[in-house]
Regions:
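Active-site region of PLP-dependent enzymes
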Residues: 33-39, 46-126
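Catalytic PLP-binding core of fold-type I/II PLP enzymes
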Residues: 1, 5-40
Length: 126
């Protein structure tokens, strides 16, 4: 897991090289670096998956626990959705025991409004 901290990305070339040598998957922890870039690419979109926290104290915080996972891998995306929705594949069909980790409408609305201000908040910190 690569952890980007204080708005600064870690050395993703080195992380990805080590992962490739050892056939490992890489998850980027982007919780404290929303909007940061590494060599012109947004963090979270470099490795196999990126995770973001929307805990109230974070740069983009909701008013309760919340988070997001991003990936370009369709299998990872499907499995993540299933885990977040009680292991459900389709209505009344659950492949495994998952959990309820869906973002509720109130938190989504709060984040939607705050997201419009994120870039200016980031710029004011620099």
């Amino acid at each position: 897991m690569a952890v980007h901290l204080y708005g600064h990305p870690c050395d993703m070339d080195q992380v990805m090289e080590i992962a490739k040598e050892h056939n490992l998957k890489v998850i980027e922890d982007c919780a404290q670096a929303h909007g940061a870039e590494y060599k012109g690419k947004k963090i979270g979109a470099i490795a196999d998956a990126g995770v973001f926290s929307f805990y109230p104290g974070k740069n983009l915080g909701a008013y309760g626990d919340a988070g997001a996972i991003i990936t370009n891998n369709d299998q990872v995306a499907q499995k993540t959705r299933m885990i977040a929705n009680h292991g459900r594949i389709e209505k009344y069909n659950h492949e495994f025991e998952g959990r309820n980790s869906r973002l509720d409408g109130i938190q989504a609305a709060i984040l939607s409004v705050k997201l419009k201000h994120l870039e200016s908040w980031i710029n004011s910190r620099v």
